[in-house]
Amino acid sequence: MKDLKILITLLLILFSVGIYSIEANQKVENFRLNDQLGNSHELFYYSDHEALVFLVQGNGCPIARNASVRFHELEKIFSEKKVKFFMLNSNLQDTKRSILEEAASYNYQLPILMDKTQLIGEALEVTRTGEVFVINPKTWQIAYTGALDDRLTYENQKKEASEHFLKDALDEITEGRAVTLATTESLGCLINFPEQRNKANHKLISYSEDIAPILIDNCTACHRKGGLGPWAMTDYNMVKGFSLMMREVLRTKRMPPWHADPSIGHFSNDRSLSAGEMRTLVHWIESGSPRGKGKDPLLEAEISDSVWSNEPELGPPDYVIDIPTTDIPATGVVDYKYHFVKNKIGKDIWVRATEIIPGDKAVLHHVITSFGEINVKGPRKGRLNFRTMKGLRGYAPGIN
């Protein structure tokens, strides 16, 4: 009998560990995700709110579908109290199209943040759809995590809930009180996080074979000596030193600088990272950025800095316009600068290609080039005439 009691106790301890995923008072790091409509949401942008509420959504989960009705009702109650509601989808199998179809079928009116890399769900340790969690923007900690209420179980559902866990927590937060019940058991469909189970293997990610090639293909065009990046990826030590900053800008999508929606069409010169590349980089950083074996490809990388990138196809340029050198102060506000260059061609021509070559990529932010006639009188004297002005070429960081 004593052995049986010990076994039961152990089972209860193990079971209790597995009930809850997100921990109350857990600190939440900043992230950015797109919703099903293409809108971008950065967590820390909502710092002026009283609370941020998330329902973990997944297509096909009956509990999440059922809970969404009450979740929308609570949104209408608390939106006037500066509480923002979201859904979070970390399912591997759900696509943007299928999420849109699910939203239309069940009348979801809230942003569904699509965590296609699963990095955010992993970091939050989400386990099931139907789970709700509340973030307090004053501390960026989890204020409540668990079930929305006690109305739903796996086999049954009550007509009315007798315990209103989420509503009670939001009442307390918006009234400036501490949350009395910060954690409850959540029910729903288990979410498959394969990389979470393979966490031990993240230390085996190869810097030489996996990490450095991603950086060379996607980052070193800017992050190199003389490039427009603020620091140069010259070797492993530099990358390791900036690795935590890299993780931050990857999670918030500040890097790589690419804003087009990857689910719509194909874009030339796409600088975005694939979901697999994002996972590889972040998991490598989270495992301590191990050096591993092999050469350092960054030491041997040949970074092309072609002055005239069209030369292989079109040959040397027919016309080169030099802009006078300008000294830019290291700090302060610089007025918008206009440079006028006389067109010396003297005849109409067809333009096949143009290119802007910055003198210092670390200083130049952008260029807009136009051509046309100059105003000789009026308030815009000495400036281009809008009626004759035509655009020619632009430049901004990251443009090829």
Residues covered by each model-derived region:
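Bacterial N-terminal signal peptides
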Residues: 8-18
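A short beta-strand-turn-helix
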Residues: 31-52, 200-209
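Short active-site neighborhood of thiol/selenol oxidoreductases, capturing the structured segment around
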Residues: 44-65, 170
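Aromatic- and Gly/Pro-enriched helix-to-coil junctions and flexible linker segments
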Residues: 183-341
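Conserved redox-active cysteine motifs that mediate thiol-disulfide chemistry
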Residues: 57-70, 220-224
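Structural microenvironment flanking redox-active thiols in thiol-disulfide oxidoreductases
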Residues: 65-106, 113-123
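Thiol/selenol-based redox catalytic cores and closely related redox-interacting motifs
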Residues: 117-192
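Low-complexity, glycine/serine/threonine/alanine-rich intrinsically disordered linker
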Residues: 294-400
